[in-house]
Amino acid sequence: MKKGKILALAGVALLATGVLAACSNSTSNSSNSSSSGADQVFNYIYEVDPENLNYLISSKAATTDLTANLIDGLLENDNYGNLVPSMAEDWTVSKDGLTYTYTLRKDAKWYTSDGEEYADVKAQDFVAGLKYAADNKSETLYLVQSSIKGLDDYVNGKTKDFSSVGVKAVDDHTVQYTLNEPESFWNSKTTMGILYPVNEEFLKSKGDKFAQSADPTSLLYNGPFLLKSITSKSSIEFAKNPNYWDKDNVHVSDVKLTYFDGQDQGKPAEQFAKGALSAARLAPTSATFSKVEKEFKDNIVYTPQDSTSYLVGVNIDRQAYNHTAKSSDAQKSSTKKALMNKDFRQALSFAFDRTAYASQVNGKEGATKMLRNLYIPPTFVQADGKSFGELVKEKVASYGDEWKDVNFDDAQDGLYNKEKAKAEFAKAKKALQEEGVEFPIHLDMPVDQTATAKVQRVQSLKQSIESSLGTDNVVVDIHQMKTDDVLNITYYAASAAEEDWDISDNVGWSPDYQDPSTYLEIIKPGGENTKTFLGFDGKENAAAEQVGLKEYAKLVDEAAAEKTDVNKRYEKYATAQAWLTDSALLIPTTSRTGRPVLTKIVPFTAPFAWSGAKGRDMASYKYLKLQDKAVTAKEYQKAQEKWNKERAESNKKAQEELEKHVK
């Protein structure tokens, strides 16, 4: 059997082995010298308070961006994107790709928030973590429920015996997982919180007080930092764990995050200039930006685009109307019927000027640098030498002429087209009038009133859609609301019944692991995120069936069933993405990064990852180094060129070494 076939069956893969060569990120290695002597403190901002610190349960970035710095799992990402040892000092996978065995390091400990040693980290802690997640219906169960043998039966109550689930502590320092099918991306899942350990004794002692958002003592820590304090809408502070097993790779002594409500867009740059922040996102549309440009003309750096995709979601099953401009049931019914019509949704997508939208954040010159035209980034994976975006372009063309000349590359607006918008709307209007729909269609869109750039973005969206389609046809009704009120009807809504909007740009996704399924699985009927993305929940939903999501789910399942041929697998996922693109149920807008910043982070020293929780830009602090002065654009470019070359070599070497893990 050829080595390549063994590795495919064994289910091991790097970050898609060279697939990402066309992409880079703002985090990793550099030759720049960092400041020395005094302790380094990383000062930055945060924008959303965490609901809790429960890394085993929460899928919210507001939680995981914090806990990934406090808790270590089996593996983590280095500054080149390789998966390297963390709690596991070594691992093996069986030749059939079904059994992963991890050998834990013996110097790993649990510590209290005061830094006092509590216990050794043992294999049973990983078993306890998964059991707790299953028993408490973790928001991230979708990551592993169908992967780990017996877990689905346990979650669905077919068995109450957790020992039948494919995770076991072979001994104190060996944990083993048995999968249902090979997964080439399994190891990348180990960076996610649901597969982190928890000390069972501590967990029981805390009960329902475990992992409370404002209580650092409600957690144990085995990671690089200890949480010192959280004050809602004020600050979050970490301190370096002085006894951490890998403390030599923790270069900052403290992390201090200050709450930013987004109202004064120029404030981060002002704080950076005063030395109060280590890095600052810039707002080219702010009144003070010309001053920033003058003072830091050589230091403005645009971070490369990452794998986080932001979108406009369409609520296909709205139930709440506490925040609406609609004055009658007829208007509510008309909007619902319009949003169920694919031609109408496509008209919205083609009518939306994303460049103008992004310019509210990046300014006119930098607007295109953050644009995204596909839910899954076009370079996320490739098959037979073609990027994922190229595969989708080929497949979506079969849905209609409107797609034949669309460019899905990043950093340009391949979708905005007034003529196409009008043509699709004309088709939609004819069909909707036959259904008795009243025009104009009113679309309620909530926005945080304190976040100036967010308000300006949705105002831009309103302007371009209404300009393209006419206010006699479509009116976007913007609802400016308090921060918590917006979050409670979008991001933090407990159920679809509380999703009180027609269209929303409070929608985004960062991939959990290195496979297209991480994007596509979550919006199948029954998926955890259908309420936030599309306004419905449950597997059997009439609206979801009406818009064709059962067909979509079938395409995703067909791709997931391809376990041995990666090229065929990605081709099939491209087919599913093509269906989703044509449906216009999700309208892509931007990536998370691709924005202008000022920074004292030594370029490319922080961990890098296209997926998982251990390499988020500006949110992963292990490895990160600081320098005394702001990085110049010239320094950054030189460091990036060096890092790209080193990363390619490092990834290649890591890929070659995978064979030794197959036993």
UniProtKB/Swiss-Prot annotation:
<feature type="lipid moiety-binding region" description="S-diacylglycerol cysteine">
    <location>
        <position position="23"/>
    </location>
</feature>
<dbReference type="GO" id="GO:0015833">
    <property type="term" value="P:peptide transport"/>
</dbReference>
<comment type="similarity">
    <text>Belongs to the bacterial solute-binding protein 5 family.</text>
</comment>
<keyword id="KW-0813">Transport</keyword>
<dbReference type="Pfam" id="PF00496">
    <property type="entry name" value="SBP_bac_5"/>
</dbReference>
<comment type="function">
    <text>May be involved in the expression of cell surface properties important for colonization of the human oral cavity. It may also be involved in uptake processes.</text>
</comment>
<protein>
    <recommendedName>
        <fullName>Oligopeptide-binding protein SarA</fullName>
    </recommendedName>
</protein>
<feature type="region of interest" description="Disordered">
    <location>
        <begin position="637"/>
        <end position="663"/>
    </location>
</feature>
<dbReference type="GO" id="GO:1904680">
    <property type="term" value="F:peptide transmembrane transporter activity"/>
</dbReference>
<dbReference type="GO" id="GO:0043190">
    <property type="term" value="C:ATP-binding cassette (ABC) transporter complex"/>
</dbReference>
<keyword id="KW-0653">Protein transport</keyword>
<dbReference type="InterPro" id="IPR000914">
    <property type="entry name" value="SBP_5_dom"/>
</dbReference>
<keyword id="KW-0571">Peptide transport</keyword>
<keyword id="KW-0472">Membrane</keyword>
<feature type="signal peptide">
    <location>
        <begin position="1"/>
        <end position="22"/>
    </location>
</feature>
<keyword id="KW-0564">Palmitate</keyword>
<keyword id="KW-1003">Cell membrane</keyword>
<dbReference type="InterPro" id="IPR039424">
    <property type="entry name" value="SBP_5"/>
</dbReference>
<dbReference type="GO" id="GO:0015031">
    <property type="term" value="P:protein transport"/>
</dbReference>
<keyword id="KW-0449">Lipoprotein</keyword>
<dbReference type="GO" id="GO:0042597">
    <property type="term" value="C:periplasmic space"/>
</dbReference>
<dbReference type="InterPro" id="IPR030678">
    <property type="entry name" value="Peptide/Ni-bd"/>
</dbReference>
<dbReference type="InterPro" id="IPR023765">
    <property type="entry name" value="SBP_5_CS"/>
</dbReference>
<feature type="lipid moiety-binding region" description="N-palmitoyl cysteine">
    <location>
        <position position="23"/>
    </location>
</feature>
<keyword id="KW-0732">Signal</keyword>
